Every structure is written in structure tokens, then in C-alpha cells.
């Protein structure tokens, strides 16, 4: 019977395909009631929400080995997001569907970087995006760059809480298509009009994200003034309602941390659905601070972002939605309106629905109902890979994006698929119980070598959790080190090394791997780390770190910068690094980390990593 198990699964898969094809639908359909475009009680206005696309236009192609068979499938991609939107437009009529994005759409993916953001701009123009706000990573670019993109857009960029101090402009401070808010007029088939007011909000980068004028392109934003979120929302909402808005939505880059176990279940949600709680652990959560003080009736819904988590939740009776990063999902908020006795359309808040998270997939795993990258072991729980349909229509590459493929794909593929290096000599990349990590150590050694630094240290998050021995392409290097990060060096004393490393290891949740350092740590019962001793490897031999001696430290711009929220931006580490940055003593490369690393490993052929974790020369040593 066990031997027959794979064949039974194949037979079941064949039956599913046959039944689906007989019904005219290829694959799995949803097991919930969808919103009827011709509902007799309400006029529904669908609002599509995406956020944190981070420049990922093309899908990621995954390969997993199941026995002797290799499964190939795609994860994410705007070609599938476009298909959902156009199916929805067919159902409701294009005039009734609105599409908004919550920001962070340029910075990240190789396609956006390679083509200077143009591929993202072209997509939003072609698909007919109605509006966006800007996220914290839009501030990574020079202000003139963002303004040029906004001015070329066919949609509105909505940011209400800013003003340019030099020109005193509010509307238009970010370019020709920048508005503080906008009323979208939806003409119904009976010629009635429903007005949706949308207010854009972004982070106060000089407060919430601590944007200094010393790091890279962010100096070009120095003349920007940020207003209070609450005051701006209340005043603008009142203004929009006086202008006839039947509902007011906040388009933001704010998000919540919510329980993802329940949240990732695809369903049609309402305010009484069990969705999984959202947590108030993050004391810096802008959205919770806003929700705690906002008055009822100011905002009817929120499109968010930033946390890279699924959100289809109601907090303080306000529906909110955001999705995980990299164009892997989208949500749809359905706003129901009903005419009152005076003939005015009133939003029926209690009947608002959110459909999602909708997976951007042409194939999904039957049980998990998504197309995330999984291991061969996880395949048994995820279920067989089947074609996917939504509302009776197959999800596939929408033909509207074909001109963008014709324009960009060949050049992208040629660049991305360059072979750089083959890593071997290990079963897989993993962190052992000491905190040492093979891939971390490999890259940190390279960074120290490139910059001829005494040591290098970077947070764990920059490296993937797992990697099997393989040949890495140019795209692999980029994906492991995205966001245009750069290698930076700074001279520090031995005493400063102890303060910096002591801070980041004690306040951080994960280990900070390093090159040429031995960090001896104690961990208490609560998991809190304490650095007991730091020593330096010089030509393989341990040396004491001398307090008044100068050493060259290498790290990344993102990790060192106080904008990152990383542990370098805390305590004594912050005081040391921030002062050196102000004094222009932090020197950053002109090239990005992925460029420098690809150049470093190019031509090395096969690299054996078997000795990158050496028990006799530990980099992180846990004192029992």
C-alpha cells in the first residue's frame, strides 16, 4: 500500500484535473460565497490593495525534487496580480473597481533596479493603478528621482502629511501628480455617482524612521516637513465628506503584526470573522497609536503596508488590509452602499467584506492554497500542485503585461542568469547551536577581504536561512543582498568595539555573525545574551583587543544606519556610530553589496565551504 501511495496521488490529481476541465475551470475554486456584482441589497465597490511589492515584477521560479520528478512552479509576480484585477473588472465593470498600492514598490527586486524603476512605473500605468502612497524605502532614492517617477505616472501619488519647507508647497511637493487626497467618482450603470475619498499618509521619516541627513540619498529630503497624522486625517476627512465623499479610505504605509497562522487562510472575511489577533508588542507601531485616538466616523477603511504581513482585520471597527511582500498576494475590500430615503448612497460599515489573501499563482498546492517555496518534506502537508482558478477563471499571465515582457525580459534574463560561483562542501546552509552560519561566515570573510578590514559584522537577516549546494547566479547574489545596500567601513577603537558588539548582541533577538572575531557569550533562561569577551583572529591566531588601538570595521550601510531599526541603532552602539556618521567618518562604497560580492566570487569556480564553521576556531562561542 505504501508503494502505491505516489500512484494514488497521481491518479487523484488526474481526476481533479479532469473534473475541473469538464467544469470549464482548471484547478481549485474557493469554498466561500463571493460578492455578487448585481447584489439586490447593496452596490458593492471593490478596492484592490497591494503593498510592499519591492520591485518584484517577474515571478520567482521554484524547483523542488519529489522522488525522481522535479516540480517547477512560479511564486508571485505582477502578471498574476493583473489577472485578478482584470477578472474583477469583467465582473463588476472597470468603472467600479479601484486599485491602490501602499508603497515600497521600487526598492528591492532586481528587475526594478536593473531598469531604474521604469518597469514598475510602466506596469502601474498599463494596469490602471488609481493611486499610491510612498513607503519608507521610497526615501532611499534621491528626491529628484522619485519626483520624476511621480510626474510620469498616470495615477495620483497621495501623501497628505508633508510640506516642502523651501517652497511651502503641500500639494505638488513631490511632483506634478502628487496630491494630498483625492475623490474618485464612480459612475454606476444608472448614472448615479458614488464618491470614494482617499487620504494618503506616509511615515514621519524624521521621527518614526529617524531619517538623518548623513546617510546616502536621504540628505536630499532634508527640506521636507512632516505633519501630525491624526490632525491631518480628521481635517481632511471632514473636508472630503463636505465635498460629497460617500466613504473615506486612508491609504498608508502603516501596518500591524498579526497572527499569520489564521490570517493566511484564503477566505471572505467580515468584522465578525475569526481572523487571528493583531499584537501591540511593537511600541513603535504608528497604526496602533493612530487607532487608539482616532474618532469613529473619520475613516471607513485602511490600506496599509510596511510589516510584510497579511492583514484583513478589523480594529476599533475599522477594516484594514495589507499583504506579504514581493507581489505574492493581494486583498480586495468590498464597500457596500445603500441609498437612503433622500437618495444619497450610505456606506453600510457592518457589511464590509475583505477577500484574501489571494495568492499570485498560476498553480497552488491543494492543501495550503498558495504557491510558496517549500521543501520536499513540506510537500506532503502542502498537497499536490494543481492549476488555480478564481471566480471560475484560470489565473495565468495576463495578456496586458506582454508588452512589458517584450520590452524587458530578454535583457533581464541574460543579466540575471549569469553563473557566478559554485558553493559545495556542505549538506545545506544552516545555523548551528553556537550561532555560527556557513554562508554568513563565507560572505563576511569576503566583505572583510574586499575592504581589507580587521573584522566584519552584519545582522543575520541579510542571509537566507537555507541554501543547498549549487551554482549561484547573478540574481541569486542580488536576492541575498537586496535594497541597494552597500559595504561601509569605519575606524573604531578596541573599547568602541566592545561597546558596539556588546550592544548589538545583548539587545538583538538573533546572533550577529562576524569575520575575524571570537565572541564569547552567556545566555540566560529568558534567552537574553551577554557578551563576556571579544577577541580578534589575526592570521588564525587569537589576539586580545586593545582598548586604545584603532581597528577597521566593515558592515553594511543599512545595518549601521539608524534608519534601519537594527540593533546598531540602539544604546552605546548608536551613540558611537551616529557621531562618526555626522563627522563623515563612515565611508561607504559606490557599488552595492551584491555587485561587490558577485565581482569578488566571479571566476573562483568551485568554492569549498566545509571549513567555514570550525569548532576549533569558533566565531560565536556559547559559555555553558
Report the location of each language-model feature.
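Catalytic centers of hydrolytic enzymes
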Residues: 15, 24-84, 90, 212-230, ...
Amino acid at each position: 500500500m505504501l508503494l502505491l501511495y505516489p500512484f494514488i496521488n497521481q491518479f487523484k490529481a488526474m481526476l481533479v484535473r479532469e473534473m475541473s476541465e469538464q467544469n470549464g475551470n482548471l484547478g481549485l475554486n474557493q469554498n466561500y460565497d463571493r460578492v455578487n456584482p448585481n447584489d439586490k441589497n447593496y452596490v458593492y465597490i471593490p478596492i484592490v490593495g497591494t503593498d510592499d511589492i519591492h520591485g518584484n515584477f517577474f515571478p520567482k521560479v521554484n524547483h523542488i525534487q519529489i522522488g525522481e520528478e522535479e516540480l517547477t512552479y512560479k511564486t508571485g509576480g505582477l502578471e498574476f496580480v493583473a489577472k485578478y484585477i482584470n477578472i474583477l473588472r469583467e465582473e463588476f465593470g472597470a468603472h467600479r473597481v479601484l486599485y491602490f498600492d501602499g508603497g515600497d514598490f521600487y526598492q528591492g527586486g532586481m528587475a526594478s533596479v536593473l531598469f531604474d524603476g521604469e518597469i514598475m512605473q510602466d506596469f502601474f500605468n498599463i494596469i490602471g493603478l488609481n493611486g499610491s502612497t510612498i513607503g519608507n524605502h521610497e526615501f532611499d532614492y534621491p528626491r529628484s528621482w522619485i519626483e520624476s517617477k511621480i510626474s510620469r505616472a498616470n495615477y495620483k501619488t497621495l501623501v497628505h502629511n508633508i510640506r516642502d519647507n523651501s517652497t511651502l508647497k503641500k500639494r505638488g511637493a513631490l511632483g506634478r501628480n502628487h496630491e494630498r487626497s483625492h475623490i474618485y467618482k464612480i459612475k454606476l450603470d444608472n448614472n448615479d455617482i458614488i464618491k470614494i475619498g482617499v487620504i494618503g499618509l506616509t511615515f514621519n521619516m524624521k521621527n518614526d524612521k529617524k531619517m538623518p541627513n548623513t546617510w546616502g540619498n536621504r540628505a536630499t529630503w532634508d527640506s521636507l516637513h512632516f505633519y501630525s497624522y491624526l490632525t491631518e486625517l480628521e481635517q481632511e476627512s471632514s473636508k472630503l465628506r463636505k465635498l460629497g465623499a460617500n466613504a473615506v479610505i486612508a491609504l498608508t504605509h502603516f501596518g500591524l503584526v498579526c497572527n499569520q497562522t489564521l490570517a493566511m487562510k484564503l477566505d471572505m472575511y467580515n468584522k465578525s470573522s475569526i481572523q487571528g489577533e493583531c499584537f501591540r508588542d511593537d511600541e513603535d507601531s504608528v497604526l496602533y497609536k493612530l487607532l487608539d485616538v482616532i474618532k469613529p466616523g473619520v475613516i471607513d477603511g485602511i490600506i496599509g503596508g510596511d510589516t510584510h504581513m497579511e492583514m484583513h482585520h478589523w480594529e476599533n471597527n475599522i477594516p484594514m488590509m495589507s499583504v506579504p511582500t514581493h507581489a505574492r498576494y493581494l486583498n480586495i475590500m468590498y464597500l457596500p452602499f445603500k441609498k437612503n430615503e433622500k437618495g444619497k448612497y450610505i456606506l453600510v460599515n457592518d457589511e464590509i467584506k475583505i477577500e484574501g489573501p489571494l495568492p499570485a499563482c498560476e498553480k497552488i498546492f491543494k492543501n495550503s492554497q498558495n504557491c510558496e517555496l517549500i521543501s520536499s518534506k513540506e510537500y506532503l502537508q502542502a498537497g499536490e500542485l494543481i492549476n488555480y482558478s478564481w471566480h471560475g477563471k484560470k489565473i495565468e499571465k495576463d495578456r496586458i503585461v506582454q508588452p512589458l515582457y517584450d520590452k524587458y525580459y530578454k535583457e533581464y534574463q541574460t543579466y540575471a542568469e549569469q553563473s557566478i560561483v559554485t558553493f559545495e562542501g556542505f549538506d545545506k546552509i544552516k545555523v548551528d547551536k553556537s550561532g555560527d552560519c556557513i554562508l554568513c561566515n563565507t560572505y563576511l570573510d569576503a566583505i572583510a577581504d574586499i575592504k581589507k578590514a580587521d573584522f566584519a559584522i552584519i545582522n543575520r537577516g541579510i542571509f537566507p536561512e537555507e541554501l543547498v549546494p549549487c551554482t549561484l547566479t547573478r540574481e541569486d547574489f542580488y536576492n541575498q543582498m537586496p535594497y541597494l545596500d552597500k559595504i561601509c567601513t569605519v575606524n573604531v577603537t578596541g573599547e568602541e568595539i566592545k561597546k558596539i558588539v556588546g550592544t548589538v548582541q545583548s539587545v538583538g533577538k538573533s546572533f550577529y555573525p562576524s569575520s575575524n572575531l571570537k565572541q564569547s557569550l552567556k545566555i540566560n533562561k529568558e534567552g537574553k545574551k551577554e557578551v563576556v569577551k571579544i577577541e580578534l583572529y589575526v592570521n588564525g591566531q587569537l589576539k586580545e583587543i586593545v582598548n586604545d588601538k584603532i581597528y577597521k570595521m566593515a558592515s553594511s550601510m543599512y545595518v549601521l544606519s539608524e534608519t534601519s531599526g537594527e540593533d546598531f541603532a540602539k544604546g552605546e552602539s548608536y551613540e558611537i556610530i551616529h557621531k562618526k556618521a555626522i563627522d563623515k567618518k563612515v565611508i561607504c562604497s559606490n557599488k552595492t553589496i551584491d555587485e561587490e560580492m558577485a565581482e569578488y566570487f566571479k571566476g573562483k569556480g568551485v568554492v569549498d565551504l566545509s571549513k567555514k564553521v570550525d569548532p576549533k576556531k569558533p566565531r560565536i562561542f556559547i559559555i555553558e
